């Protein structure tokens, strides 16, 4: 709305005393002021109200000609809206203003003749042959998981582009039989490709592929009365599970990072649903959770909450990101919320069939709407999550 000092009472009367992202615009050619606040009315009164004495506080009363705002229902929504607003208003400098910390990822470089894994915070163009797994809380956590996991395989750790030469002396990993040593033709290209495929499947399944492989070998050894080998395989299996226990639930192949985040809404009797598609955050949609007696007329057949959620999500379009940088920024916002010690809202990820756990989603909607703490369930720990996926795939435990 338009603003002038003599209209401050009108502005302060309509501005909500709740969270919002706002833009203050001055005359033509001037730079807008963008910010977020947990109480928009109070912030505008400080920025646009009559200054008290010789205060050094920022006051834009005589410069602002127009005020815009978007009400938000949660800190996560405020952060997302602030990101979009700054990106629109300052396309060249918004990243410096936001200072987002990009999410650490495990990158499997598949377009190299001899693929390898590394840890990065950068995503290459979509045409590259790399696969990414994450987001991890820190680079140290990503490196530890990658190193502990690669100990179970014989894929190379070196970073050089290889030109295989039988005269090459190799490295400590080849000496310890922890690498197939393609650098000096210690294996054929086909053998190395098979090992890379095993690593790729391990990361994509959260370690379950290797668990199945070792369990099968252990059971075969026991059936053949080779109990010494079975015991060694069991110890190896426990080490794999220790590595898997490091894995937060949210860490997945980025293309499989799909789910639904539920946050409080600025709208009355509603929650905000944020669809997550391949780590990209869709615009929020409101879900009215008023009682049936309030929201449904006698002529309208009532819908279950599950059906209403599915109907709302079906109409949500995935965001069309124009660059890998935008993808990284969405992951940074998601990672920042997920790894907070104290956070508002709930996140539910899809299973290996692409389906949401709808019963838990419905319960989550109720908890967020009522402001209750999340109820502990399979989404709380990585170990339980991957055991759930193993159960769904028909994999028996010990």
Predicted regions and their residues:
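Conserved catalytic/ligand-binding micro-motifs in nucleotide and anionic cofactor chemistry
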Residues: 1-398
């Amino acid at each position: 709305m338009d603003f002038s000092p003599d209209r401050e009472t009108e502005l302060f009367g309509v501005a909500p005393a709740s969270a919002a992202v706002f833009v203050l615009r001055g005359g033509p050619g001037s730079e807008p002021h963008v910010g977020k606040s947990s109480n928009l009315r109070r912030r505008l009164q400080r920025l646009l109200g009559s200054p008290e004495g010789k205060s050094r506080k920022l006051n834009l009363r005589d410069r602002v000609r127009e005020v815009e705002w978007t009400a938000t229902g949660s800190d996560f929504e405020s952060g997302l809206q602030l990101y979009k607003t700054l990106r629109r208003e300052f396309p060249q400098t918004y990243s410096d203003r936001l200072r987002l910390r990009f999410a650490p990822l495990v990158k499997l470089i598949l377009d190299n003749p001899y693929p390898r894994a590394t840890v990065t915070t950068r995503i290459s163009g979509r045409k590259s042959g790399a696969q990414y797994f994450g987001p991890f809380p820190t680079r140290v956590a990503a490196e530890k998981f990658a190193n502990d996991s690669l100990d179970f395989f014989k894929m190379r750790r070196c970073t050089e582009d290889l030109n295989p030469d039988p005269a090459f002396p190799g490295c400590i990993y080849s000496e310890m039989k922890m690498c197939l040593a393609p650098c000096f033709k210690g294996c054929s290209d086909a053998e190395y490709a098979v090992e890379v495929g095993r690593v790729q499947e391990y990361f994509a399944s959260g370690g379950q592929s290797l668990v199945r492989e070792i369990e099968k070998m252990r059971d075969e050894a026991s059936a053949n009365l080779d109990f010494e080998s079975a015991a060694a395989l069991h110890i190896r299996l426990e080490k794999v599970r220790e590595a898997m226990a490091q894995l937060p639930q949210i860490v997945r192949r980025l293309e499989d990072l799909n789910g639904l985040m539920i946050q409080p809404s600025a709208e009355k009797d509603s929650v905000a649903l944020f669809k997550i598609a391949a780590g990209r955050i869709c615009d929020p949609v409101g879900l009215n959770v008023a009682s049936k007696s309030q929201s449904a007329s006698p002529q309208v057949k009532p819908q279950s909450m599950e059906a209403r959620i599915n109907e709302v999500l079906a109409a949500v379009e995935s965001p069309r990101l124009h660059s890998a940088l935008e993808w990284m920024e969405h992951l940074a916002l998601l990672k920042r919320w997920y790894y907070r010690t104290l956070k508002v809202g709930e996140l539910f990820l899809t299973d290996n069939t692409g389906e949401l756990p709808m019963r838990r989603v419905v319960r989550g909607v109720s908890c967020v709407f009522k402001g209750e703490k999340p109820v502990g369930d399979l989404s709380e720990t990585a170990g339980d999550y991957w055991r759930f996926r193993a159960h769904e795939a028909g994999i028996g435990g010990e």
